[in-house]
Amino acid sequence: FNEWGVSNKTDQYMFKIYAGQLSIIRRSEIPLSNEVLVRNGLDPSTTLSVNINGTSYNTVQPKIQSGDPYDVDEDPNSPDFGSNKKYWTIEIPRDKFNGDPLNGNGPSGYTIRPEKVTMWKIEFGWYGAIGARFYAYIPVGAGEARWIVVHTLVIENSLYGPCLRDSYFRFKYSVNVQDTSNIRTPQYVYKY
C-alpha cells in the first residue's frame, strides 16, 4: 500500500491506496466520538467491522499501530513505551467520501487515476477545532486542472480534548510492498 499526507507525534492525516482503492486515514491519540463517526459516514451501529490493510477489526475505530517501524511511543508513562505507537485509527473509503468520490459520478465527473493526479492537499485547523479537508488536483482539459474537495472530516468542537497538539506537521509518505513476487519494475515516490 501507499500512504502520503501529514504527520506529527500525536496525529496523522493521510491519503492511502491499498489494493487499488483510494481512502483517507485519520490517526490520533484522541478518538472520535460516535456522534462524529456518524457524521462522517462511519456509524458504529451499522458498521460492525472494518478492514484496514488486510486485517479485520470489530470496531470502526481500532487503536492500532501505524505500520511505521520508526513511530515509537516515547511517553515513559505509557504502557506501550518503547514499542510501536498505537493510534485511534479511522479509514474512510472512497464510497464514504462526502465530497467528490472521484468515481465518475461526483460533481467533477472524474474517475480517479492516481498516476494522473499531480497534487493532493490537506487543510486542517490546529487543535482540531475545524476538522480537515482533503483535496485532489485533477485534470479538467488540455493543460488545465483544478482543486476539488474529496472529503471533509467534520469534527468541529466535538472532541473531549485537543488533538493536533503540535502545529508543525511533516510531510510523510510510505510505499509498503509486502509481496514483491509480481513486481517487474522499480517503484518510486516523487515529492516536490
Question: Which residues are covered by each model-predicted region?
Answer:
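Short helix-loop boundary/capping segments
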Residues: 59, 63, 67-101
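Localized edge beta-strand/strand-to-loop motifs within extracellular or lumenal beta-rich domains
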Residues: 115-131, 137-139
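Ligand-recognition surfaces built from glycine- and aromatic
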Residues: 156-192
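Short, surface-exposed beta-strand/loop "edge" segments at domain boundaries and coil↔beta transitions
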Residues: 7-13, 30-39, 142-145, 176-189
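A recognition module on extended beta-rich or small alphabeta surfaces enriched in W/G with H and D/E
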Residues: 50, 57-60, 72, 166-178
